[in-house]
Amino acid sequence: MTNLDTASTTLLACFLLCFCVLLCVCLLIRPLLLSVSTYTSLIILVLLLWITAASAFRCFIVYIIFVYIPLFLIHTHARFLIT
């Protein structure tokens, strides 16, 4: 196994870990329960992007910027509204 294969596998593992964490967050927080279908659709699009057009690293960066950070901001805003 080369370094590239190891890095690719590690990146995929991080990607799937983030996916599982965010899916659990969506399921545990009631206002985000309705966003599960939207989130899964988005993750399928990111995976299709990874398979067809971009490298794993680029897709991971896209995932962080356009999925992970916005969901964190939505969660923070919801907590602010509750308190």
From Swiss-Prot:
Compartments reported by the entry: Host membrane; Host endoplasmic reticulum membrane; Host Golgi apparatus
Biological process annotations from GO: symbiont-mediated perturbation of host process; symbiont-mediated suppression of host antigen processing and presentation of peptide antigen via MHC class I; symbiont-mediated suppression of host apoptosis
GO cellular component: host cell endoplasmic reticulum membrane; host cell Golgi apparatus; host cell plasma membrane; membrane
InterPro entries: Papilloma_E5_alpha
Transmembrane segments: 9-29, 42-62, 63-83
Chief localization: host cell
Topology of this chain in the membrane: Multi-pass membrane protein
Alphabetical keyword list: Early protein, Host endoplasmic reticulum, Host Golgi apparatus, Host membrane, Host-virus interaction, Inhibition of host adaptive immune response by virus, Inhibition of host MHC class I molecule presentation by virus, Membrane, Transmembrane, Transmembrane helix, Viral immunoevasion
Self-association and partners: Homooligomer. Interacts with host BCAP31; this interaction seems to correlate with the ability of HPV-positive differentiated cells to remain competent for proliferation. Interacts with host ATP6V0C. Interacts (via N-terminus) with host HLA class I heavy chains A1, A2, A3 and B8; these interactions inhibit host immune response by sequestering MHC class I peptides to the host Golgi apparatus. Interacts with host TMC6, TMC8 and ZNT1; the interaction blocks their negative regulation.
Function, in words: Acts to keep host cells in a proliferation-competent state upon differentiation. Enhances host epidermal growth factor receptor (EGFR) activation after stimulation by EGF by inhibiting EGFR internalization. Induces a redistribution of host caveolin-1 and glycosphingolipid (ganglioside GM1) components of lipid rafts to the plasma membrane. Since GM1s inhibit cytotoxic T-lymphocytes, block immune synapse formation, and enhance proliferative signaling by the EGFR, E5 may enhance immune evasion and cell proliferation via a common mechanism.
Family: Belongs to the papillomaviridae E5 protein family.
Further details from the record: HPV16, in comparison to HPV types 6 and 11, is more often associated with malignant genital cancers in humans. Part of the antigens expressed and presented within HPV-positive head and neck tumors.
Protein name: Probable protein E5
Gene assigned in the entry: E5
